[in-house]
């Protein structure tokens, strides 16, 4: 038998074996999981979409999670959480999620991390054990602390560099042609612009203009999302097998990031070693997140400082946090601005605001005060988050102890995951007029009517959170980078509208393509295009 014939025969036998054995293996793992590892939910916990007293979800209800999650969440809100009732929902793969009414939120957030853990809940959602190789990157998320404590206090200086990088990225990825219209894939183009701008913040110059580094970051972000979905949907017993397989390509791209970062890392670590760690940073020292990470590690995590793979993985996760949600938000904002322009004159209104507050010179310094005055741009961003938020639940916790009861008498079993619905409240007709219509100035109109009473309308700003508005979470674990995102999205929209004319292709008839649901995630329309031309 020839080698090629043998290989073909082996491949055919392997495929036949796999087609039988893999489903059997998954089924066997499911039975073992149900018998020995499944969480025992209390008998008085109702199941969404099922008759009273039912203890297991039907395939129909599970299928709805994947194909009609928006309606499933709306029914859950109307039938249970709106009425102050706790309920169980099917989730990704074999997961179940306990959904709590908003009236419980204050009590849930009052529990310490050792009882209701935010970090453990996020580890389950993102599956960092397999994407980054260790749970410490979320269990000990000290780079996030640096964003909250150090970077947010230096926003204006940080954003000077990001603004400069945005101009460079727009010119590179969109162009400067003032004569001809150009049609672009919006999501893919904005993703590269934001990766470049975010990299100016995370690693600084020159890596933020290194195409190989930026492409590797892009692929790592996609890999983290894919791993969270696929590994998270896998039965827990099989994750040690499938997790490493699913993340093979992701690990290769993290290695590419490490190789690109290594020269910068070595140079900076050497410079730090020549300084006394107690000294203040040199005035010429880089002012990016990576430098802050190295300085912190020098003082507080010396083992990690000299562990390039670990620092590279922390940087990769920081890039993911800085890019993923912002890309989705800005893509949706641009689609919404263009689609609402015919009714609300959105583009002209926003251009006037930029002219009045920032001025026509794109080199003008952006300040916290100026950003706070841009309430129309702020409203455009908040309305986009209200209607097109990628995440539709918030305030995730894992139950680590027995004995915690909800206000309606449900005991939360140890090991369960709890969260709160977001979208049904953000699209509630009792709160919002015409709730599924995009109204760019919905929030700015309210704020303009009460300009002297800033406190009364402060909860309507883009960065504000509440139990009824959860895109950034709420409470002590709400997104620490949202203040940077506030600067960034306003700078992007300002530069785009002041320097480019934008419109939809003729075949769109002035209407934005519909967003697409992927289970419970709401994604921008794939392949959505806009026509764009540089203004003279």
From Swiss-Prot:
Annotated membrane topology is: Single-pass membrane protein
What EC number(s) does the entry state? 1.-.-.-
Which pathway is it part of? Secondary metabolite biosynthesis; terpenoid biosynthesis
Residues that hold heme according to the record: 479
GO annotation terms (biological process): mycotoxin biosynthetic process
**What does this protein need as cofactor?**
heme
Q: Where in the cell is it found?
A: Membrane
The family database entries (CDD domains) matched by this protein are listed as: CYP503A1-like
Q: What class of enzyme is it?
A: oxidoreductase
Give the transmembrane region(s).
Answer: 20-39
Q: A cellular component term (GO) from this record?
A: membrane
Keywords per UniProt: Heme, Iron, Membrane, Metal-binding, Monooxygenase, Oxidoreductase, Transmembrane, Transmembrane helix
GO: which molecular function terms? heme binding; iron ion binding; monooxygenase activity; oxidoreductase activity, acting on paired donors, with incorporation or reduction of molecular oxygen
Please classify the protein's predominant subcellular localization into one broad category.
Answer: membrane
Q: How is it used?
A: The fungal sesquiterpenoid aspterric acid (AA) is a submicromolar inhibitor of dihydroxy-acid dehydratase (DHAD) in plants and is effective as an herbicide in spray applications.
The record's similarity note reads: Belongs to the cytochrome P450 family.
Q: What does this protein do?
A: Cytochrome P450 monooxygenase; part of the gene cluster that mediates the biosynthesis of the sesquiterpenoid aspterric acid (AA), an inhibitor of dihydroxy-acid dehydratase (DHAD) effective as an herbicide. PbrC catalyzes the third and last step within the pathway and converts the alpha-epoxy carboxylate intermediate produced by the cytochrome P450 monooxygenase pbrB from (-)daucane into the tricyclic aspterric acid.
Give the protein's recorded name.
Cytochrome P450 monooxygenase pbrC
């Amino acid at each position: 038998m020839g080698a090629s014939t043998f290989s073909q025969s082996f491949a055919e036998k392997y495929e036949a074996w796999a087609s039988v054995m893999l489903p059997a293996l998954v089924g066997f793992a499911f039975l073992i999981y149900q018998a020995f590892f499944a969480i025992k939910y209390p008998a008085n916990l109702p199941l969404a979409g099922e008759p009273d007293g039912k203890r297991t979800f039907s395939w129909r209800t599970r299928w709805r999670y994947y194909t009609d999650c928006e309606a499933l969440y709306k029914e859950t809100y109307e039938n249970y959480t709106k009425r102050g009732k706790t309920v169980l929902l099917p989730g990704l793969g074999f997961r179940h999620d306990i959904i709590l009414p908003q009236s419980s939120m204050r009590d849930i957030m009052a529990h310490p991390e050792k009882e209701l853990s935010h970090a453990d809940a996020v580890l389950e959602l993102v599956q960092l054990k397999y994407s980054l190789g260790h749970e410490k990157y979320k269990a000990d998320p000290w780079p996030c602390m640096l964003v909250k404590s150090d970077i947010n206090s230096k926003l204006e200086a940080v954003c000077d560099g990001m603004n400069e990088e945005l101009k460079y990225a727009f010119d590179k990825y969109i162009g400067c042609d003032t004569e001809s219209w150009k049609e672009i894939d919006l999501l893919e183009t904005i993703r590269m612009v934001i990766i470049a701008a975010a990299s100016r913040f995370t690693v600084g110059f020159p890596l933020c203009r290194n195409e190989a580094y930026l492409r590797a970051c892009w692929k790592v972000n996609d890999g983290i999302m894919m791993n969270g979905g696929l590994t998270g949907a896998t039965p827990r017993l099989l994750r040690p097998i499938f997790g490493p397989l699913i993340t093979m390509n992701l690990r290769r791209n993290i290695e590419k990031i490490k190789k690109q970062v290594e020269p910068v890392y070595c140079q900076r670590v050497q410079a730090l070693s020549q300084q006394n760690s107690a000294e203040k940073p040199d005035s010429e020292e880089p002012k990016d997140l990576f430098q802050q990470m190295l300085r912190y590690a020098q003082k507080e995590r010396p083992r990690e400082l000299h562990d390039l793979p670990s620092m590279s993985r922390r940087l990769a996760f920081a890039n993911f946090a800085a890019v993923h949600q912002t890309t989705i938000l800005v893509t949706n904002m641009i689609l919404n601005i263009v689609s609402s322009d015919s009714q609300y004159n959105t583009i002209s209104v926003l251009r006037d605001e930029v002219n009045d507050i920032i001025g026509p010179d794109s080199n003008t310094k952006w300040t916290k005060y100026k950003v706070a005055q841009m309430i129309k741009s702020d409203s455009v961003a908040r309305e986009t988050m209200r209607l097109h938020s990628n995440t539709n639940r918030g305030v995730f916790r894992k139950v680590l102890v027995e004995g915690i009861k909800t206000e309606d008498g449900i005991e939360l079993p140890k090991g369960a995951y709890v969260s709160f619905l977001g979208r049904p409240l953000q699209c509630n007709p009792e709160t919002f007029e015409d709730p599924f219509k995009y109204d760019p100035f919905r929030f700015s109109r309210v704020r303009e009517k009460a300009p002297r009473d800033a406190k009364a309308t402060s909860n309507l700003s883009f960065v504000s959170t509440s139990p009824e508005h959860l895109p950034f979470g709420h409470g002590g674990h709400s997104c620490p980078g949202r203040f940077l995102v506030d600067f960034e999205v306003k700078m992007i929209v300002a530069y785009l509208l002041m320097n480019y004319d934008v419109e939809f292709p003729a075949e769109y008839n002035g209407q934005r393509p519909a967003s697409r649901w992927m289970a419970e995630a709401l994604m921008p329309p794939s392949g959505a295009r806009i026509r764009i031309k540089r203004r003279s």
